[in-house]
């Protein structure tokens, strides 16, 4: 039973075995070795790139093509040039490689060597006859591609030696195509040969490269406008892909099929450059109109004999027209090219002067296109379109291109077009916001125009030139103004507000623009302004209620002087209204304890808008003429005089005005606000700009650096000053009481005390950059000292962008003696000023050394000297030192507040203030002895010298920029080389990996043999088992 069961199982196993996969395997294994066969050319290129000359020679003997090119058109010689393999280059050239063979982009080996900067290869190739005037597909010669100076020099010398005309070389292809097209047209037979790889025709090349003359001639000769290359591309595909608008227009005018697709189903719209998609859509609409008109013409079934005759005559006329216009083309082709150059130059100029936004330009170009459409089209039309002129489209014969202008089409002038259309629409083509903003570049304005002035000016500008200037943008030069007027005559008005550029610290663009404005506009000189002021002083020796003073808009200097001179009493509570610097008036003048004659009061400080705009040629003058609002806090009565509003706030004793609010208000008139920067950033920027701003006329670089150092020191000491602030105030109160008692003794001692207090308050103000309002009693001395400090702070903030100071050259001689005295008095004053931090005194000295005008720093003894000098002058003695002092004092007190904006130059305001309070008669006596002409000549000479230095500095800066650019370019090239080295290393690593893989592949047959042996053994075992089972 057991044996029967075993046999049955074995039989079942055998049944399963028969027909199984293993049983179906043949008993003898077929061993077919599959080999990868490479193209001979690919093997040759690989051998060349590896540098194996023996292998290359074997392949050449076997019949390999030495000029074999890969898919990119690169030959072995190209690759050797790129790899910097000089030996292989020489080997290939010696073995007959074509030295001028181009790749798919038209690059010959010399292009590759020039691009990589391999001098030795380039020299060898040139020596072997490489063509230095060879042009690639983009019209670049090896000289254009060369980056390193040595390579450029080598190629340029070779071009000069061979006498190659580069421009002629660029146009060589177009010239040859024109010649062939004319031959085909004259012979009536087209002998074109398609490109071997792409199947492209002459029409494809002319369309892709924008050879419009060739394109017209080929179409005229009877070329099919819808001809396809091997990829199914039509000439319209090529023209659209390469963005050639004129070529697209010519093809569409000749009724090419715009819906044709290439082999991958793309229309011309799918492959078109983004820039001309809209233009293609417009052309399609135009073509649809033409087709519908043709259908309308063909609708009559019966044609009269007259129409037939017309058609016959039209055909003959077409032939005649061809004969007539053909020589015109030959003769005037050069003219057309010159005309195109002129057009491009005009476009460049228009780009510079363009100040409108892109939307405005579109509207502008559309309106122009409409006017152009209404002009009669003097082109010769076919019989089909001769009767329908109502539509603004004309179909021309193939000879004459349509004069139709569309909103986005830049149209060059061709000699065959009958209508002449201005290419103004091309402005938009290369235009970016950077280019059109250059037209109205905004200089860093240091004082914004008043709202009133800006609105009036804006209205005036709109009425005249159609351009709205921003408050700080310079007037355009006369040439730009003329262009704007020309635009207006065409019926276009362009509104533009210059972009708000943050204030910059004397950047090169500012300097250049200011120099331009200096040359294009006449300026009112400083001596003129001062003499005008001097005349006014003589006229107004008594109190003059309604007097107005003209002042040059280039120096915004009268603000503090006018305010200080119009304080008639020591206990007054003045409120100064400043309608953005256009109106200043003192509203209240209460009890008078000391009667001092002043030059003006109330309305005497008004300066009308017309006077403000007195020297309106220069925008810089406009800017400087607008002083910042002045804030005068007086002990019990705090007055915040912000722009255009007068605020009178009565507070109790001890109220301190909000200095932060004052500063906010003041800054709002100093810096034009940018939309994208936050309020805190804007404040910080404007404060920094005010502190270290320099003028274009009188500040030297050393002055600016010293000023910045001073500001740096003041910031470090600011925290300490705040800690000592309360102590200072207590000290001041005590001193105020003492001065009140001393005041009763004599006027002279009281004035001395004023000066002590004034100079101290002055220094504190300088340290804190904001007005200090004392909360003490309402004594005259406290109110005056507080007012003077606030005036000083406002003059700091109102630093105008004008002549920074009279020259440092002549002022140093005047002030040297006084400086020495000031340093001695510093030590004596230590006992008095113990409450003040040491940093104040330390900072006072460098400021004193930076003075630009002849006003000495105030000390008690020097003030006594001044009083002695003044009395000497009144008696009639004219000592030299007294004269110079009176000159400098007079300039300080009379020119205007801007002369004392010297927060950077460290001048004492108490000096000029007290000088204002003295009678006019004594000052006028001193004024008579001054020689303003000599001073003016000195200033002028110094300014010229500084301008020359500035110009030299600018030149050096531009040179440095050029060197920097060259250096960065070199670094980029070095980076490219390192990248190339990395690629080489990667390639070597990959080659090693390939060789390892090949070794493993060699082991593969052994493994297969082992596998087969095991299979055979398995089959044998199975057979043995099956026999045993039986």
Curated annotation (Swiss-Prot):
Q: What, per the annotation, is the impact of changing residue 1028 to A?
A: Loss of binding to PRKG1
Composition-biased stretches, type Acidic residues, lie in: 357-369, 861-875
Molecular function (Gene Ontology), one example: phosphatase regulator activity
Which residues carry the post-translational modification Phosphoserine, per the record?
A: 299, 422, 432, 445, 472-473, 477, 507, 509, 601, 618, 692, 695, 802, 852, 862, 871, 903, 908, 910, 995
State the CDD domains in the record. IPD_MYPT1
Q: What is the effect of changing residue 1007 to A?
A: Loss of binding to PRKG1
Q: Which residues carry this modification: Phosphotyrosine?
A: 446
Instruction: List the residue ranges of the region (Disordered).
Output: 290-628, 643-928
| Stretches of the chain forming a coiled coil according to its record | none
- Chief localization: cytoplasm
Cellular-component GO terms for this entry: A band; actin cytoskeleton; centrosome; contractile muscle fiber; cytoplasm; cytosol; focal adhesion; kinetochore
Alphabetized, the UniProt keywords read: ANK repeat, Cytoplasm, Cytoskeleton, Disease variant, Hydroxylation, Phosphoprotein, Repeat
The ANK repeats extend over 39-68, 72-101, 105-134, 138-164, 198-227, 231-260
Q: Where in the cell is it found?
A: Cytoplasm; Cytoplasm, Cytoskeleton, Stress fiber
The protein's PTM annotation reads:
Phosphorylated by CIT (Rho-associated kinase). Phosphorylated cooperatively by ROCK1 and CDC42BP on Thr-696. Phosphorylated on upon DNA damage, probably by ATM or ATR. In vitro, phosphorylation of Ser-695 by PKA and PKG appears to prevent phosphorylation of the inhibitory site Thr-696, probably mediated by PRKG1. Phosphorylation at Ser-445, Ser-472 and Ser-910 by NUAK1 promotes interaction with 14-3-3, leading to inhibit interaction with myosin light chain MLC2, preventing dephosphorylation of MLC2. May be phosphorylated at Thr-696 by DMPK; may inhibit the myosin phosphatase activity.
How is this protein organized at the quaternary level? Answer: PP1 comprises a catalytic subunit, PPP1CA, PPP1CB or PPP1CC, and one or several targeting or regulatory subunits. PPP1R12A mediates binding to myosin. Interacts with ARHA and CIT. Binds PPP1R12B, ROCK1 and IL16. Interacts directly with PRKG1. Non-covalent dimer of 2 dimers; PRKG1-PRKG1 and PPP1R12A-PPP1R12A. Interacts with SMTNL1. Interacts with PPP1CB; the interaction is direct. Interacts (when phosphorylated at Ser-445, Ser-472 and Ser-910) with 14-3-3. Interacts with ROCK1 and ROCK2. Interacts with isoform 1 and isoform 2 of ZIPK/DAPK3. Interacts with RAF1. Interacts with HIF1AN.
Which disease is noted in the annotation? Genitourinary and/or brain malformation syndrome: An autosomal dominant syndrome characterized by multiple congenital anomalies including urogenital malformations and brain abnormalities ranging from agenesis of the corpus callosum to anencephaly.
The name this protein carries in UniProt is: Protein phosphatase 1 regulatory subunit 12A
Q: Which organism is it from?
A: Homo sapiens (Human)
Print the organism lineage: Eukaryota, Metazoa, Chordata, Craniata, Vertebrata
Its gene name is PPP1R12A
């Amino acid at each position: 039973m057991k044996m029967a069961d075993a046999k049955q199982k074995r039989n079942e196993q055998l049944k399963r075995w028969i027909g199984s996969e293993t049983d179906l395997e043949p008993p003898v294994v077929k061993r077919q070795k599959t080999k990868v066969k490479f193209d001979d050319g690919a093997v040759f290129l690989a051998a060349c790139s590896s540098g194996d000359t023996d292998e290359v020679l074997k392949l050449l003997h076997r019949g390999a093509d030495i000029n074999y090119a890969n898919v990119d058109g690169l030959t072995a010689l190209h690759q050797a040039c790129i790899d910097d393999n000089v030996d292989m280059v020489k080997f290939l050239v010696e073995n007959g490689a074509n030295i001028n063979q181009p790749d798919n982009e038209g690059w010959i080996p010399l292009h590759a060597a020039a691009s990589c900067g391999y001098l030795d290869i380039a020299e060898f190739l040139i020596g072997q006859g490489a063509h230095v005037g060879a042009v690639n597909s983009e019209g670049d010669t090896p000289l254009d591609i060369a980056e390193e100076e040595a390579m450029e020099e080598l190629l340029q010398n070779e071009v000069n030696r061979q006498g190659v005309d580069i421009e002629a070389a660029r146009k060589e292809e177009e010239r040859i195509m024109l010649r062939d097209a004319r031959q085909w047209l004259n012979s009536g037979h087209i002998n074109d040969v398609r490109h071997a790889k792409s199947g492209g025709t002459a029409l494809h090349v002319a369309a892709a490269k924008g050879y419009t003359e060739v394109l017209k001639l080929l179409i005229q000769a009877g070329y099919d406008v819808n001809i396809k290359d091997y990829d199914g591309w039509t000439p319209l595909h090529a023209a659209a892909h390469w963005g050639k608008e004129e070529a697209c227009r010519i093809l569409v005018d000749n009724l090419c099929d715009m819906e044709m697709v290439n082999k991958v189903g793309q229309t011309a719209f799918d492959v078109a450059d983004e820039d001309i998609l809209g233009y293609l859509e417009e052309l399609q609409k135009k073509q649809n109109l033409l087709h519908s008109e043709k259908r309308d013409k063909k609708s009559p079934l019966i044609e009269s004999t007259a129409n037939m005759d017309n058609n016959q005559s039209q055909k003959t006329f077409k032939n005649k027209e061809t004969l007539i216009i053909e020589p015109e083309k030959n003769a005037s082709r050069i003219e057309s090219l010159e005309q195109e150059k002129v057009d491009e130059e005009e476009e460049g100029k228009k780009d510079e002067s363009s100040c409108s936004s892109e939307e405005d330009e579109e509207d502008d170009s559309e309106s122009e296109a409409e006017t152009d459409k209404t002009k009669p089209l003097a082109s010769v039309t076919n019989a089909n379109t001769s009767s329908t002129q109502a539509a603004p489209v004309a179909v021309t014969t193939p000879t004459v291109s349509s004069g139709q202008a569309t909103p986005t089409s830049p149209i060059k002038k061709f000699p065959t077009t009958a209508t002449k259309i201005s290419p103004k629409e091309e402005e938009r083509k290369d235009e970016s916001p950077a280019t059109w903003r250059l037209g109205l570049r905004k200089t860093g304005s240091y004082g914004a125009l008043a709202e009133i002035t800006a609105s009036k000016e804006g209205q005036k500008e709109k009425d005249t030139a159609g351009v709205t200037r921003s408050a700080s943008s310079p007037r355009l030069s006369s040439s730009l103004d003329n262009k704007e007027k020309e635009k207006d005559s065409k019926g276009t008005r362009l509104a533009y507000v210059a972009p708000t550029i943050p204030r910059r610290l004397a950047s090169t663009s500012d300097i250049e623009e200011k120099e331009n404005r200096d040359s294009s506009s006449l300026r009112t000189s400083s001596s003129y302004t001062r003499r005008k002021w001097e005349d006014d002083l003589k006229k107004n020796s008594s109190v003059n209620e309604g007097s107005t003073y003209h002042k040059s808009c280039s120096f915004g200097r009268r603000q503090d002087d006018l305010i200080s001179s119009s304080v008639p009493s020591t206990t007054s509570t003045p409120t100064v209204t400043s309608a953005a610097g256009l109106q200043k008036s003192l509203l209240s003048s209460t009890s008078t304890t000391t009667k001092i004659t002043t030059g003006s009061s109330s309305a005497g400080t008004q300066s009308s808008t017309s006077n403000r705009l007195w020297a309106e040629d220069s925008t810089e003058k406009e800017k400087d003429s607008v002083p910042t609002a002045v804030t005068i806090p007086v002990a019990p009565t705090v007055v915040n005089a912000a722009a255009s509003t007068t605020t009178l706030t009565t507070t109790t004793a001890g109220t301190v005005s909000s200095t932060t609010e004052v500063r906010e208000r003041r800054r709002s008139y100093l810096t034009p606000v940018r939309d994208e920067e936050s309020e805190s950033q804007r404040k910080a920027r404007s404060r920094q700009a005010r502190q270290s701003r320099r003028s274009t006329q009188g500040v030297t670089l050393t002055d600016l650096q010293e000023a910045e150092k001073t500001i740096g020191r003041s910031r470090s000491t600011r925290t300490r000053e705040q800690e000592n602030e309360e102590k200072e105030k207590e000290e001041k109160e005590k001193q105020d009481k003492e001065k009140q008692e001393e005041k009763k003794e004599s006027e002279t001692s009281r004035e001395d005390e004023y000066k002590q207090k004034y100079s101290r308050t002055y220094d504190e103000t300088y340290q804190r950059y904001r007005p200090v309002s004392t909360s003490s009693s309402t004594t005259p001395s406290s109110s005056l000292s507080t007012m003077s400090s606030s005036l000083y702070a406002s003059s700091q903030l109102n630093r105008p962008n004008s002549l920074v100071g009279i020259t440092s050259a002549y002022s140093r001689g005047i002030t040297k003696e006084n400086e020495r005295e000031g340093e001695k008095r510093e030590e004596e004053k230590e006992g008095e000023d113990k409450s003040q931090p040491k940093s104040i005194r330390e900072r006072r000295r460098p400021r004193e050394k930076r003075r630009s005008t002849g006003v000495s720093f105030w000390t008690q003894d020097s003030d006594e000297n001044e009083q002695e000098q003044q009395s000497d002058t009144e008696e009639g003695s004219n000592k030299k030192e007294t004269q110079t002092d009176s000159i400098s004092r007079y300039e300080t007190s009379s020119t205007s507040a801007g002369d004392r904006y010297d927060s950077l130059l460290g001048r004492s305001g108490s000096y000029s203030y007290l000088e204002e309070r003295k009678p006019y008669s004594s000052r006028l006596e001193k004024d008579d002895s001054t020689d303003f002409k000599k001073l003016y000549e000195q200033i002028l000479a110094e300014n010229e010298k500084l301008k020359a230095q500035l110009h030299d500095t600018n030149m050096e800066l531009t040179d440095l920029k050029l060197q920097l650019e060259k250096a960065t370019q070199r670094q980029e090239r070095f980076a490219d080389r390192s990248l190339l080295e990395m690629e080489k290393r990667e390639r070597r690593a990959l080659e090693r990996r390939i060789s390892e893989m090949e070794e493993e592949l060699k082991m593969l047959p052994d493994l297969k043999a082992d596998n087969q042996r095991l299979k055979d053994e398995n089959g044998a075992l199975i057979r043995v088992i099956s026999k045993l089972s039986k």
